[in-house]
């Protein structure tokens, strides 16, 4: 797989993105099915056209015939969860989300960190985590988007994005920016000097007294 190739090339962290034209609707259905939230709660209100309620009813009329609803994901066995997610992706996931789901699973199997950003990449993360809950330890949100779908995904996963730039652009921009955060964090862990190594004088009195010893 492509994740295997990147791992063989020595990569430890990857950023994912999407370019699909229909992917937003796909991510809405995928997210609502996995988290259990109502379509009405994650549809965006618009000044013109059908109301949120009308749009939600239209989506229901199309999706419900495919029997993708799951009352309790936690009650399913591993194989049942996998089959249910595969059925969901086949019906409503779209190529972008289906491919990204497989890629995330492959990357996590190699203990590679995966940075995601918007509602579409978040839907793939939800699908991957539903198939294998341990994947959650390897996924990192990056930019905070105002999309209700994206907010619901982060709420369900229990994670918070760290970049707040009011981004409106997809195609992995937010994920790529998130790579810099991980890179900086690793430099701090591995390369940052201690006060002693940097020859910073220890406090002679006050709260910091006695916490370190300077070089003679």
Language model region names:
Residues 1-216:
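N-terminal loops that bind phosphate or other acidic moieties
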């Amino acid at each position: 797989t492509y994740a295997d190739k990147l791992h063989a090339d020595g990569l430890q962290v990857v950023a994912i993105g999407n370019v699909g034209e229909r992917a937003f609707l796909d991510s809405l259905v995928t997210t609502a099915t996995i988290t259990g939230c109502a379509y009405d709660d994650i549809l965006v209100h618009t000044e013109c056209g059908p109301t949120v309620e009308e749009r939600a009813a239209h989506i229901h009329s199309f999706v419900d015939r495919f029997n993708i609803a799951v009352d309790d994901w936690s009650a399913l066995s591993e194989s049942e969860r996998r089959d249910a997610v595969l059925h969901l992706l086949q019906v409503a996931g779209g190529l972008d989300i289906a491919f990204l789901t497989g890629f995330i699973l492959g990357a996590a199997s190699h203990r590679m960190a995966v940075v995601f950003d918007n509602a579409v990449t978040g839907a793939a993360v939800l699908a991957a985590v539903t198939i294998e809950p341990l994947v959650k330890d390897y996924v990192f949100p990056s930019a905070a988007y105002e999309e209700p779908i994206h907010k619901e995904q982060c709420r369900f996963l229990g994670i918070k994005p760290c970049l707040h730039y009011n981004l409106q652009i997809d195609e992995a921009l937010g994920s790529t920016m998130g790579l810099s955060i991980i890179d900086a964090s690793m430099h701090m862990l591995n390369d940052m000097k201690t006060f002693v190594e940097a020859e910073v004088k220890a406090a002679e009195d006050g709260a910091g007294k006695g916490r370190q010893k300077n070089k003679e």
